Amino acid sequence: MTDPIMSNETIIRRSANYRPPIWDFDFVQSLKSEFVGELNIKRIDKLKEDVKMMLNKTMAPSDQFELIDTLQRLGLAYHFGDEIKRIVKSIYNSHRNDNTWMKEDLHTIALQFRLLRQHGYNISQEIFDIFRDELGNFKECLHEDIEGMLSLYEASYLLEEGENILEVAREFAASCLKKYIQVNKDQLLSMIVSHSLEVPLHWRMPRLETRWFIDIYEKKQGMNPLLLELAKLDFNNVQATYHEDLKYVTSWWRNTGLGEKLSFARDRLMENFLWTVGVNFPPQFGYFRRISTKVNSLITVIDDIYDVYGTLDELQLFTNAVERWDVNAMDQLPEYMKLCFLALHNSINEMAYDALREQGFHIIPYLKKAWADLCKSYLVEAKWYYIGYTPTLQEYMDNAWISISAPVILVHAYFLEGSPITNEALKSLKEYPDIIQWSSMILRFADDLGTSSDELKRGDNPKSIQCYIYETGVSELKAREHIQYLIGETWKKINKEREYIDSPFSKIFIEVATNLARMAQCMYQHGDGHGIEDGETKDHVLSLLVKPIPM
């Protein structure tokens, strides 16, 4: 029997040949964790109190920062935000008043530099001058200090524009670390170094890094069993909250009928939820993850309507309907678009109602504008496709940082992350502040590096790599290197935004925007992790959302 929503006898439609989802409704609804219940919560609370005592104990600043770094990498820092904030502020203020800490070793100074910058303190790159010779080069004797080299390498990724000392530090440390793993004197340390060289800590998706680091920490000499037990219990407890989030969003998705009726589109609910875990993992942000998953799923379907299925006339009608944000605009839409538009309209209006009820702000104008801007950017790319136009890289990026959908994701995230809504932030939000633009750029570049080959094979528009090749005549390898360079340059701008100077946005929102960039590099590191489910993405889903850590 032919589906009336999908049938069309006169129009030839393209197909991306996306595979059906590997995580079905029944599988998600069956997810169950044994790491829930009063006994687990009591044990976690007891261990948390023990850690608070450790944090409040008098110890050297270097030991305090080692503990904070371990807590962050084990995914536990969110429990101790006030204590960590107090310690970091105290150490920063003491550093401003004396230079005794400059007598520390390279590892300690680099670790403190990284953590202070991570927490928004603009500590000078010149603290590394004591490790440089009169010509400005890092001293050759540092080659033997692998732990110091690793810390220096990780610290260098928090650089901002114009910080040449950190550029030189990165090259020096990377060269040393690459030589070390060839010798492989210490298997565990070599594994940690290789992991860092593949993707630096500052660019990694936090929750996936936590899962990896828990296994590493267990093998480390001097490991604290208390911290390890808490990390495992907490990871499994948080995973159990994800199960409840997933059951909610899979029921919502099934009720929309979009996965069933619009078979040309990617049905990727589990992957869309994984994005939200990458962006904001703590358990208390369940509402954030649930609504963000709806947003991500709607974006995925609408993207496929513009990229694959819709005709140019239909796409113009859909764009107009979203701009009007009026259910009466549905009358002119074909049947398959009516279903999508109504799901979009109802889901976003429901979120706006929650914001009006809870905070007294009418946010539909901001949400509507973000969706309209997205659809208009999709329409630009559709027109380019139909006339066979290849833009310059700059012309492409002027549109593509919006069409990658990060502005829509982050505008919604602002209203979901729980901080008070302010008029100053709303004014900035309308024009898409720098933190949104820079996060969007990295998502676009990472997506293009991971997906452009597959998309070109099925006849899609040229992406940033192809635009740069067309414009300059360089090889694909050189073009990819250029896009990687642009990712690095954009990270410098994000790092500047993370100083929170005169920002109308909360630290939570800026962290969410940063994490979106991190999640992009995770999802597209080995290809199209969003469209193709059965590679690295499947492993990520299993390790973060399905399989608990053995105790």
Curated annotation (Swiss-Prot):
Which cofactors go with this protein? Mg(2+)
Task: Give any single GO term for biological process.
Answer: sesquiterpene biosynthetic process
Residues holding Mg(2+) 2: D303, D307
The cofactor binding remark recorded in the entry reads: Binds 3 Mg(2+) ions per subunit.
What is the enzyme's main class? lyase
Entry keywords, A to Z: Lyase, Magnesium, Metal-binding
Where does motif DDXXD motif map?
303-307
Q: Where does Mg(2+) 3 bind?
A: E455
EC code: 4.2.3.-
Question: What InterPro entries does UniProt report for this protein, alphabetically?
Answer: Isoprenoid_synthase_dom_sf (IPR008949), Terpene_cyclase-like_1_C (IPR034741), Terpene_cyclase_plant_C1 (IPR044814), Terpene_synth_N (IPR001906), Terpene_synth_N_sf (IPR036965), Terpene_synthase-like (IPR050148), Terpene_synthase_metal-bd (IPR005630), Terpenoid_cyclase/PrenylTrfase (IPR008930)
Q: Which domain of life is it from?
A: Eukaryota
The record's section on SUPFAM superfamilies has: Terpenoid cyclases/Protein prenyltransferases (SSF48239), Terpenoid synthases (SSF48576)
Q: Which residues bind Mg(2+) 1?
A: D303, D307
Q: Name one GO molecular function term.
A: magnesium ion binding
Q: Which Gene3D superfamilies match?
A: Farnesyl Diphosphate Synthase (1.10.600.10), Terpene synthase, N-terminal domain (1.50.10.130)
Q: Name a Pfam family for this protein.
A: Terpene_synth
Q: Domains: what does the record tell us? A: The Asp-Asp-Xaa-Xaa-Asp/Glu (DDXXD/E) motif is important for the catalytic activity, presumably through binding to Mg(2+).
Q: Give the record's family classification.
A: Belongs to the terpene synthase family.
Function of the protein: Catalyzes the cyclization of farnesyl diphosphate to sesquiterpene olefins.
Q: What is this protein called?
A: Terpene synthase 10
Task: Specify the species.
Answer: Ricinus communis
Specify the taxonomic lineage: Eukaryota, Viridiplantae, Streptophyta, Embryophyta, Tracheophyta
